[in-house]
Amino acid sequence: MKILLDSLPFIRIFRGQIIVIKYGGAAQINPQLKEKFALDIVIMYMLGLKPVIIHGGGKRINEMLDIMGIESEFYNGYRITSAECMRVVEMVLSGEINKELTAFLNFHGAKAVGMSGKDAHLLQAKAKDNGALGYTGEITAVNPSFLLNVINDGFVPIIAPIATGEGAGHLGYNINADIAACHIAKALSAKKIIFLSDIAGVLDSNKEPISSLTPSDIKQLQKQGVINGGMIPKLEACVDCVQNGVEKAHIIDGRIEHSLLLELFTTQGIGTEIYNGQDK
């Protein structure tokens, strides 16, 4: 009873609010964690929150590329996506993971609907770094009206981070899921964006989690080399969000059962909170 009473102030704050969740890491692979995640989403939905889920799939993509004898290449945390690789990326993200997750959430009681960024021009993109990363793209436009219609009709959108390219015959673009989640959160004026990861949050030089950061803190940590690899695009996304209308961004440990509920409905929360240097 105490847990429920303690959560009431947070339920009042978040009821009716859009919460964007980037779903990835162990929570996307471990069967027990998948089930806890699904239950968290159902509870959020039943309490009147409006979850929007963008999923990754890097490990599954790498596994499929290995099976097909295609090398996985990365630069500064971004995948270099050849035409051959792009076909595999879309097959795994849109054809496998998206449908599996949608079915799984529906089974647990959410009204989930799966889609990719190609649907209704949800995500439009151009080649990142003038094509140096192949079919890895950067988002140029988001169609929020389509998503808002889906949300306001009582559905939970499950989005694969594939964007529409130039022309009908274009393969489309592979979008970093963290960046896609950020653009969607901004377009929807989301209350929060939450990134599920396989670490306890952003770690300092002693590998201890940092409870809160501002964009200037993040810049300093990058200069010191504390932040690197796949954490770079994740934190770039967080900074972009909090500087463009999203109240707070959170990086939390998806390996902890019910991590979403712990972040949203408890005073202490978990992981690292990023805010824009004003009031926390």
UniProtKB/Swiss-Prot annotation:
Enzyme class: transferase
Gene Ontology BP, a term: arginine biosynthetic process via ornithine
Pathway of action: Amino-acid biosynthesis; L-arginine biosynthesis; N(2)-acetyl-L-ornithine from L-glutamate: step 2/4
Pfam family, one: AA_kinase
Function of the molecule: Catalyzes the ATP-dependent phosphorylation of N-acetyl-L-glutamate.
Gene that this polypeptide is encoded by: argB
UniProt main location, coarse: cytoplasm
GO CC annotation: cytoplasm
Protein name: Acetylglutamate kinase
Classification via InterPro entries: AceGlu_kinase-like_sf, AcgluKinase_fam, ArgB, Asp/Glu/Uridylate_kinase, Glu/AcGlu_kinase, NAGK-C
